[in-house]
UniProtKB/Swiss-Prot annotation:
Alphabetized GO MF terms: dipeptidase activity; serine-type peptidase activity
GO terms of biological process kind: proteolysis
Function: Hydrolyzes dipeptides containing N-terminal aspartate residues. May play a role in allowing the cell to use peptide aspartate to spare carbon otherwise required for the synthesis of the aspartate family of amino acids.
Organism: Shewanella sp. (strain W3-18-1)
Cited InterPro entries: Class_I_gatase-like, Peptidase_S51, Peptidase_S51_dipeptidase-E
EC number: 3.4.13.21
Encoding gene per record: pepE
Protein name, UniProt field: Peptidase E
Length: 236
């Protein structure tokens, strides 16, 4: 079996409907997977039922059977029974906290390694990396560890933009990621702009979408990654 994981920067790009831009990216992962489990734990400011309803509506044209993990009495069994795994955006710290709380980290990692398709956007992409140390989110709750699913062996930074508001004196995103690379100079960070995604298929990794990504690693800072780039070397 081969890993088949799609890591989306965001649920929207511009003013497009929820998950609409992601449909062409997600569709290839659904050809042999109809029964999907959605993990809404990153959704702190909405009910899990409402979050699930938004995802079901957003992906309606794919005709998938999507249930929320919160609807199942045994979250671990729900993961075991699923053909595919969806993890949505929101607060990455809360998401990871709940994954640890329900003992899902190793189980999801093993399922994905065995070939179960994985789709994560925003926080759901963050937790697919080595750790959540490069998330943009507020640490509203403390998970037992920052270590994440390790579906890819590097760091991710979704929603990437290095825009600086005129007159604003806070650090840019690039400056924040530089801080990480000073502490962990050997760990790559891929910063993904909205509208783009990383697709891992076994030992291959490619950048999809309409906007470039950026690599931060050691002395390499904000190195442009064009759309369509083969990034398979980062999996080694």
């Amino acid at each position: 079996m081969t890993i088949n994981a799609l890591l989306l920067s965001s649920s929207r790009v511009g003013d497009t409907p929820y998950l609409a831009h992601a449909i062409p990216f997600i569709k290839p992962l659904t050809t042999q997977a109809q029964k999907w489990i959605f993990i809404p734990y990153a959704g702190v400011s909405m009910s899990y039922d409402n979050y699930l309803a938004s995802v079901v509506m957003g992906l309606a044209e794919l005709n998938l059977d999507i249930s929320g993990i919160h609807q199942h009495p045994d979250p671990c069994q729900a993961i075991k029974d699923a053909d595919g795994i969806l993890i949505g955006g929101g607060n990455t710290f809360h998401l990871l906290h709940e994954l640890y709380r329900y003992n899902l980290i190793n189980l999801i990692r093993e399922k994905v390694a065995q070939g179960t398709p994985y789709v994560g956007w925003s926080a759901g992409a963050n937790v697919s990396g080595a750790s959540i140390k490069t998330t943009n989110d507020m640490p509203i709750i403390e998970p037992p560890s920052f270590d994440a699913l390790k579906i890819v062996p590097f760091q991710l930074n979704p929603h990437y933009s290095n825009y600086r508001t005129p007159g604003h004196n806070g650090e840019t995103r690039a400056q924040r990621l530089l801080e990480f690379t000073k502490v962990e100079p050997l760990t790559p960070v891929i910063a993904i702009a909205e509208g783009s995604a990383l697709w891992r298929r076994d030992n291959t990794l490619v950048l999809l979408g309409k906007n470039p990504a950026y690599l931060f690693c050691g002395e390499q800072q904000e190195m442009l990654i064009p759309i369509g780039s083969d990034l398979s070397h980062l999996l080694k």
